[in-house]
Amino acid sequence: NKSKKRRNRVSFLGVATVEPPKPIPLTWKTEKPVWVNQWPLPKQKLEALHLLANEQLEKGHIEPSFSPWNSPVFVIQKKSGKWRMLTDLRAVNAVNAVIQPMGPLQPGLPSLAMIPKDWPLIIIDLKDCFFTIPLAEQDCEKFAFTIPAINNKEPATRFQWKVLPQGMLNSPTICQTFVGRALQPVREKFSDCYIIHYIDDILCAAETKDKLIDCYTFLQAEVANAGLAIASDKIQTSTPFHYLGMQIENRKIKPPKIEIRKDTLKTLNDFQKLLGDINWIRPTLGIPTYAMSNLFSILRGDSDLNSKRMLTPEATKEIKLVEEKIQSAQINRIDPLATLQLLIFATAHSPTGIIIQNTDLVEWSFLPHSTVKTFTLYLDQMATLIGQTRLRIIKLCGNDPDKIVVPLTKEQVRQAFINSGAWQIGLANFVGIIDNHYPKTKIFQFLKMTTWILPKITRREPLENALTVFTDGSSNGKAAYTGPKERVIKTQYQSAQRAELVAVITVLQDFDQPINIISDSAYVVQATRDVETALIKYSMDDQLNQLFNLLQQTVRKRNFPFYITHIRAHTNLPGPLTKANEQADLLVSSALIKAQELHALTHVNVAGLKNKFDVTWKQAKDIVQHCTQCQVLHLPTQEAGVNPRGLCPNALWQMDVTHVSSFGRLSYIHVTVDTYSHFIWATCQTGESTSHVKKHLLSCFAVMGVPEKIKTDNGPGYCSKAFQKFLSQWKISHTTGIPYNSQGQAIVERTNRTLKTQLVKQKEGGDSKECTTPQMQLNLALYTLNFLNIYRNQTTTSAEQHLTGKKNSPHEGKLIWWKDNKNKTWEIGKVITWGRGFACVSPGENQLPVWIPTRHLKFYNEPIGDAKKSTSAETETPQSSTVDSQDEQNGDVRRTDEVAIHQESRAADLGTTKEADAVSYKISREHKGDTNPREYAACSLDDCINGGKSPYACRSSCS
C-alpha cells in the first residue's frame, strides 16, 4: 500500500515506526508579543493545575518556556470530579490584530437523513484528537502560559504548548484537515461506503456488515498510521446510535429527548439561546414559522442582552408544542436509489417546505420569521422558499429535486412565470416536474393553511364601469378624497404618506362597489397593491403597524374588486385626471404646507418664503428655524468691506474661482456677481485657465447680459493676454484688486461662501433626489439665491433687481452732508445708492461718484430747493439741534434717518475689527416720538432667519 509506505519507516531493529504528522504553520498578522497577565488561582485549583501540567509535560504536549508571549490558564471541574485545564486565548485569537483565521472547512452539520436506510453503522470517536496534532515549531512560543506561585514565594513556572491548544481559533480547522487526510485512503478504497467525518467524530455505513467490518479494519490502520488514536470506550456498533446530538435507528432519525427549563428564561440572552437551539432542530421537528410567532416576538425591543423578558401565555403554549414535537418528531433515512421531491404548503404567515422521498419525510424547510422588505408577497415567499430548498437538496445529494409540488393551478403557475421575477429566479434552470397533486399521507394534516396566496380583490388593470376616486394627504394631518362625493378626514398623523394611507383606507370602507383609486403617493399605491397577500414586516412604529394591519383587514373584507394607480402631483399636464387630483390636493394643502415643501427642496430664506407665499413672518421664521441644516450652517457674517458697487445692473461685476472638492473633476467653480443687483451666476469647470474663464463668461453673458466693467483678482487666468483680448472684443473694461488682498474682492468672496453654504444645505438637508450632477446641484443653489431669497435692505429678489433695475433703498435720491476726508470739510451731495454700511454719493454735476462710509453722512435739513454749497459755516458739522427744530417744523422723520446713519456707521466700524459680531443696526422708526431704537433694530445678515424685520433679539438668534 502506497499510503503505508509513505507513513511507515523501518528502524535499525526492524520494527515499523509511525512517522509523526507534518504540522501546519499558522499565519500571524504581527510578531509583537501578546502578554496577558495570569490571574491568581485558589489553592485547590492551583494544585490541580500543577498535576495536569505535569501530566501534559510527561506526555510531551507541553515544554518549559521563556516566551515573551503569555495567555492566562485556569481549570474547571467536570461532573465526574476530574479537572480539565483550559487556556484563555481570546487575546491571541483577535482576528483583526494577531492571528490570521483559516476559515471553516465544514460550514454546517451534515444531515443524518442522507445515511442509507437499513445499512449497518459503526461510530467512533478519536481520543484527545487535538493533543495528537503537533504545532509548528515557530508557533509554539505564541501559546505560552504561566502557573503562579502563592504569595510569589517562588518563581512562577512557565510552559508552552507543542500540540493544538483547545480554544485556539484555528484548532478545529487544523484538526479537520489532519483527520480528513487520514480518512482519504479509506474513502478511495471503500467508495461505496457512506462515511461522515465531523471534527473528531466518524460514522461509517455500508450495505452489508462484512463490508462495514472491512472498512472499519482498514480505517483503524490508517488512523493509527496518522498518529491518531481511537477511543475504545466510545465505539458504537448497535442501535440506537447517538451522533451529533441525534438518535439514529435503522430507518429513523430522532431528536434528543430534552426538557426546556422555563424558569431560567428571564433575559433577552436566555431567549436568544433557546430559540437558537430550537432553530437548530426545526428541520427535524417540523414546527412551522407561524407556530412560533409569539416566541419570536419576545426578541423584539431593547437589544441589550441583559434586558428583561417575560414568557407570555401564548409563548408558553408554543414551548409546550416544541416539547411535544421533541418527544414525537422523527425523519427518515433515505433510499439511495430513489429521488427526492419538494412539497410547498401554503401555511399561515409564510409557506412551509418539506423534502420527501416517496411518502417518507426527509427534512422540513422554513423561511425566517422576519423579512427584509416591509411587504413581501406570498407568491414571492413561495419562490424564495423553493429556491432556498432547491439549494439545500443539491447540497444534500448533489441533485435537483425530481418534482416540486405547489398549491397553484397550471394557469397560475404560467402567470407566475410571466409576472413574478422572484418566481423566475426561484425556478431558474429547473427541468423537473411542477405539479399540484400532494401525496396522500396524514403527516401533513396538522399544518394550518391560508387562502391568501394570490390576489382576489386587488386588480392589476383598471376596472370598467367603476367609480373613480382621487385621494390626497398632507403633513398637517388632513386626509381627503374626491369623486362622486368629497370627504376630509382629520388624522393624528404628521406625515403626508400616513394621511394618504388613511384616505385610501377610508375610500375602501366607504365605497362598497367596484372602484378605481388614483393617488399621488407612489408609496401608498405600492403598499395597497401588495397588502392583500403580503407578509407585513413588524416595525417598532406602532402607528405604522396599526395602519398596515388595518389596510390589510379592510382589503380582505371587501366584497368588490378595486384598482389603484399613481399620478404625479403638481404637473401642468392637461386633462381631467390632473384637475381632479388638484381638487383633492386643495382639500388638504395650504400655503404653509407649500412653503415647507419649497424650503425642504431649496432652503430659501425667511424673506423669500414670505414674499412667495401668503404666510406670516413668524410662520416663515418657524420653517427656517426648524430646518436642521439651516440652523447648523447659519453662521455669523461680516461686512463685505469698502467695495465700489455698480449703480445699475451690469455696471460692475466681480469674478472669482472657488473650489468644491465633492464635485470631483468639476471642482473649479467660477463665480460672477453683479455688484448692483447681487445676481449670481456660476459654472463648474475642470480648471481655472483663461479658456475656462472665457467659457464661464460666455455662460454669464447668456444669463446676465454683458457688463461694462469686471473686477477680478490677479490670477494668471485673468491677467493673460488672451483674456484681455477677449474682453476688448466685448468692450469690457477690466480692473484687478491689490495682490494677495482678498478684501479687494470682498463682494465675490462673500458670494463664494454664500454659494457653498447653500450647496451644503441642499446636499445634506434637501428633499431633491434628482440633482445628481455637480451642475444640477449648482443650478438649484443659484435658483434659490437669485429667484427666491430676499436679502436685507431689499424688497425684491436679486433676479428682479437685475432684470428691472428696481431700487430698494429708501434713502436714494436724498440730499445729504458728506465729509471729504482729504479736505476735512463737509460738502453737500446726493445719495445714489446705499447699503452694507457704505453709500455712493454724487458730489455734483459732471463729477464722479464717491463711495464713503455712512458714518461720514448727515441728512441735509433745509428744503432741497434752497440747498447751496457751504462756505465757512458749511465746513462745520451740522448740529443735531437744527435737525430737531427742522423735525418739529416739518413733522417728518429725518432725525430718525440721521440716527440710522450713525448706527449703521458704528456697525461698519465694528465690522472692521476682530470683535465685530457681524451685525449692523438700521433704525426704521414707525412713528414719531419713539425713543428706543433697539426695539426696531433690524438684522444685517443676508440670509437672516427672521427676515431682517425682527426685534432686537434677532441678533442673538442669528448669531
From Swiss-Prot:
Keywords: DNA integration, DNA recombination, DNA-binding, Endonuclease, ERV, Hydrolase, Metal-binding, Multifunctional enzyme, Nuclease, Nucleotidyltransferase, RNA-directed DNA polymerase, Transferase, Transposable element, Zinc, Zinc-finger. Mg(2+) 1 binds at D472, E500, D520. It comes from the Eukaryota. Residues 645-806 form the Integrase catalytic domain. A motif (YXDD) lies at residues 198-201. Residues 463-593 form the RNase H type-1 domain. Pfam families: IN_DBD_C (PF00552), Integrase_Zn (PF02022), RNase_H (PF00075), rve (PF00665), RVT_1 (PF00078), RVT_thumb (PF06817). CDD domains: RNase_HI_RT_Bel, RT_Rtv. Mg(2+) 2 binds at D472, D585. A motif (LPQG) lies at residues 164-167. One of its GO terms (biological process) is DNA integration. Residues 867-893, 898-917 are annotated as: Disordered. A zinc finger (Integrase-type) spans 590-631. Residues 57-248 form the Reverse transcriptase domain. The LPQG and YXDD motifs are catalytically important and conserved among many retroviruses. This protein is synthesized as Gag-Pro and Gag-Pro-Pol polyprotein precursors. These polyproteins are thought, by similarity with type-B retroviruses, to be generated by -1 frameshifts occurring at the Gag-Pro and Pro-Pol genes boundaries. Belongs to the beta type-B retroviral polymerase family. HERV class-II K(HML-2) pol subfamily. PANTHER family: ENDOGENOUS RETROVIRUS GROUP K MEMBER 10 POL PROTEIN-RELATED, ENDOGENOUS RETROVIRUS GROUP K MEMBER POL PROTEIN. Early post-infection, the reverse transcriptase converts the viral RNA genome into double-stranded viral DNA. The RNase H domain of the reverse transcriptase performs two functions. It degrades the RNA template and specifically removes the RNA primer from the RNA/DNA hybrid. Following nuclear import, the integrase catalyzes the insertion of the linear, double-stranded viral DNA into the host cell chromosome. Endogenous Pol proteins may have kept, lost or modified their original function during evolution. This is Endogenous retrovirus group K member 113 Pol protein. It comes from Homo sapiens (Human). The lineage of its organism: Eukaryota, Metazoa, Chordata, Craniata, Vertebrata.
